[in-house]
């Protein structure tokens, strides 16, 4: 397909992320060790729904994020991680993309159970519970990204161990677990309700994930290993469109029951990912890595990563300033203060970046001022769209820069915020999130950068990268 067509589709897809994101974990009620690293191959999200639907779904996800951050009763994180395993080299899991399924998510291939059963899950930094569709799941039967329906069969797994509903883990740590417990030995149940009216219901326990370890020196063949006691939800009933494009969710959220915490505990206390251009073809891939990433060296910028309960299960950062064309914008400081009902989070499950109203108005006004000479067109859901071919010469796009605490500067490529919406049409690809409210840096703005979440030392590192293998 011509790049123009891909642009249309994938940016058309821009509106659907949060639903997919929700399926991926955004609207989910989900919520250290050897010098090894784990790689999960990521592939770009694909086009499918309309741009308006993508934007709508992102708004649903933003509402979910806001609701969780506003909650006054936050569950404690479960200390489910075990001691680091024996010295192992890199941990690599093959991943695939959600691009060809019509979602805006990045998918990972995940193997769980004994014997291992393969699944395609959404890699989601906003989720704290990994879950898969289970046998007996009641919902419209849809093909998984692999081409055929996949369901987890806990009865076939020798390593599956459900949590009793009477256990402290169920009552205190599992997000959105059900309070009813008629028999103490009954399995721990959950009922997730999403902002787009989707839901997922099932039981939770632990199982073993199969990972591929490779030598730390880069040599030698990969060898299989088991990551034990991974917290896993077995979803037996689900409703809505959010779950049609994947087999479930791989939780990368800020929670000790998430897969990210479990894997990072064994592989260096950190994980990283690099999102390729969201318009990249299906055969272009990147990686989700557990453990130190050699490619993220001295050239990286870094800023403190906020991991306290106030923002869990999300990853927050402090924004010091935003500038357009080298000019700092007048945005009130409280907009970036998570303790004052503001703040900013980095979210792989949201596609379009959503800014709190004061920041949105300032950024869009500055960008549109610089583009005043380009003919405007109307295209929902965006406020500013342009006929990009009207002048004959492609207009110059002003540089957007986000400066984080510690003087770390993010300068995303212009295609990450002035996006392709239709043939010959570009839009300022940002959404207004209201105020008070949190701002969300979506996966489009994150593309073509390597992001490392150093959980052990509470740093977020990033640098520009093409990401492709």
Could you say what each language-model-derived stretch is?
Residues 2-50, 113-115, 123-128, 139, ...:
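Aspartic protease catalytic domain
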Residues 2-101, 156, 160, 208:
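N-terminal zymogen propeptides
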Residues 79-110, 314-333:
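Charged, flexible boundary elements
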Residues 89-92, 97-230, 236-238, 243-245:
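Signature of the N-terminal lobe/flap region of pepsin-like aspartyl proteases
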Residues 138-168, 269, 301-305, 362-380:
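Cytochrome P450 catalytic domain signature, combining two hallmark sequence patches
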Residues 186-195, 256-258, 270, 378-390:
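Charged, amphipathic alpha-helical segments
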Residues 187, 197-314, 425-469:
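Aspartic protease core domain of the pepsin/retropepsin superfamily
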